[in-house]
Structure formats: C-alpha cells, structure tokens
Amino acid sequence: MTAMFRSFASFNYRTWFAGAVISNIGGWMQATAQDWVVLTELTDNDATAMGVTMALQFGPPLLLVSLTGWVADRFDRRKVLLTTQTTLMLLALGVAALLLTGVMTLPLMFCFAAAFGVTNAFDAPARQAFVSDMVSLEDTSNAVALNSASFNMARLIGPAVGGLLIVALGSGWVFVANAVTFLAMIVALLLMRTNELVPRVKNRASGGLAEGFRYVAGRPDLIVVFVMVFLIGAFGMNFPIFASTMALEFGQGADGYGLLSSVLAIGSLTGALLAARRDRARVRVLVIAAGGFGVASLVSAAMPTYWAYATVLIFVGFSTVTMLTTANGYVQTTTTPALRGRVLALYMAVVMGATPIGAPIAGWVADAFGPRAAIVVGGVAGLLAFTIGIGWMLWSGRLHRREDARFLLTLDETRPLSVVKAMQPRAFEDRATAATTPIRLPRDTED
C-alpha cells in the first residue's frame, strides 16, 4: 500500500471512505440545489437572502459548541453519527416534499437551513474525531487528508450532476436523491468492526468545554491556526455566493453554476491528495496556502470570461483544501486525545461558525457592489491570514531569515511550543521541496 493510501489498510476506514464518497456526492447535489432555489426560485437573485440561509445553516456549530464537543467526547461517536445521518436524511426528504408540492417558501427554507445546521453541529465534531478512532495516530493526518479527498471527489461530481438534475427534473428531486445517498453512510457505520476501533482515552475531569478552551488558550500555535482559518472561512470561503452570482454575471444558468463548483473541486481534490502524501501536518504549509488563496482569489475577481474565471478557481480550490486539510490534521495530531472532541468542536465552530458572520456581508457586498467586489474582500482576508501566520512564525522563533537568505526552522511544528526542548536551529535549502519535506529532530532532543 502506497504512503498516499496507507489508511486503507484499515477495513473500517475503507468502509467509511466508500460510504462517505456516495453520501458526499448527494450532499453537494443538495447544496447546489438549495443555493439555486434560494437565489432564483424563492427570491429574485437576492444574494443577501442566500447569505442569511448560509448563516442559519452554519451558525449552530458556533452557538452549540459547548454541547457538541462534549457529546463527541462523551458518547459513542459511531452511534452519534448514525443518529445525525438519519436525521439529515429525514430533513432532506422534508425539503423535497415541500418543493415537489410547490409550497416551499423562503421562511420555511430558513427553518430547514437552521435544522440542518443544528444537526450538522453535532455531526461535524463527531465525524472529525471518529477518524482517529479508525486509524492509528501515525496515520491520522493521512486519514484526514483522504477524508478531504473523498469530500472533494464528491464535490467534483455532485454540483455538476445537481445542476443537470435541476434543469432536467427540478430542485425537489435533487433533495430526494440526496436522502437516498445517506443510506450509504448509514450502512457503512453499521458494517464497522467495533472491536477494531482504536480504544478511546477517557477523560475523568469535569471541566467540559472550559477545559478545551483552557487547552487551546495555552497553545499559541492553535490560536494562530484558528485565527487564520476564521478569517478565510468568514470572508473568503463563501463559494456558493461567489460562484452563483458570478455565474449569473456571465449569463449562465443552474448547470453553469454547478460546473463552477465542480471545477473548484479539481483543485481541491489535487490539494487533498498531495496532503495525503505528507507524513504530518505543518504550520508553514498552512501559511503558504493562505497566501496562495489570497492571490488566487484576487486574480479570479479580475477574470473577464466564464472559462477564465473557472480556470482560476482550480487554484482557489487547491489552496483552500491544502489550508483546511493541514489545519484539521494539525489540530487532530497535536491535541491531547482526551480533549480531542472538544478541541475539534472548537475548530469546527471556527470553520463553520465563521460563515454566519461573513456570508451575509459577502451577500450584501455582492448585491451592492457586484460579485467581484465580494471576492476581493475574500482575497484580502487570505492575505491578512498569511501575514498573521508569517508574523507569528517570526515572532515565535519558528522561522527567521539568515544573511544568506535561507530560512531556519527552530521548533518542531507538530508539537506545542512548551514541550520542545531548546536546540540549535537546523538549516535547509530554500527550494520548492522544502515545503513538503519534514525536518527530523535529533533523537536525543525529542521527548
């Protein structure tokens, strides 16, 4: 088994991956349909209403973070996921029924978006933490990256198929199709060999989420990761708003919008697969990806034609997934196992909770000044995140310039600063391969 796919050695992970691909395809089909329904069927191209829908859907993870992280740590994650996946399937059927009978309204769609958000608030941290239950710690970063690859394989297919189904059959049937795909994930969870799951570390302390907050507060590296992800998540990752309004600007319909989402996934899938090749997640990769995202977003905003814009989206997708996969893997592999669920709940609250803040703003900017202006705001947020990351690395001593123009890494990026013993910096050449080649510490300096 190659290094890129080493997590497939686990039966449970192979089963999970297969179910996730099918379910994620349906999820992307539904996301495309929901965005298009709000933008064109329930409103007259109102991007602000679309932003409100996204805020309602992604707000609950932020509001419920104190509960969802505790649930992910306290209860059997497989059973939690069976519950959330079944609930999401029933909600999809509910939306389908209202659309097919012609009684769906914007307030009702807002209510369903909030219900999806509440359910996903419990699903996301349990789903992320469950990855570490299926594979060893050494393979966790690889499994996280392959999860992202699964997500983006689905993103490559789902939006395009969803757009075609909207044109051919109508939006309601897309929600029906998504409900059916949830069965794949439910069956995969039922087929799990529970005796092969990695034993979980029980935390007997009663600190709840406060303990997770204290843990993150004592980890400057995690704080920087959270801030960078928040900035880009709030203002740069409003792709449904950007892609749908740009599709309309270029005179495209639902199929053109779906194709843009699929093109974005080409770069996303590439980024996920490259991340799977790395043996661990590193902060500097996250920082570089944030800068790449900012530049690619600004370039995309200037594109004069539909196909030129679509081409640049490949680079936007690549940098986005490289950043998110690295951040996720870093949080998972450097967090104390007993607190992993709570810390991941905080991370998911930052990732998903940033949307309620940024999406309405992006929608308003798109309505008032045009979609290109909204994309520029996202690009600037990416460059700001890059600046914060570089500034922290310089301030913390992780990275500094030498007179011979080579960079030095002075600390192991996969550990909290407090646990790394003092050592002399080790130089490496400033060339392209340095970004993906881990730097090994001498054995006698490791804990």
Question: Each predicted region: which residue ranges?
Answer:
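Alpha-helical transmembrane-bundle signature of multi-pass membrane transport and export proteins
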Residues: 1-429
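Long, low-complexity, intrinsically disordered segments
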Residues: 216, 430-447
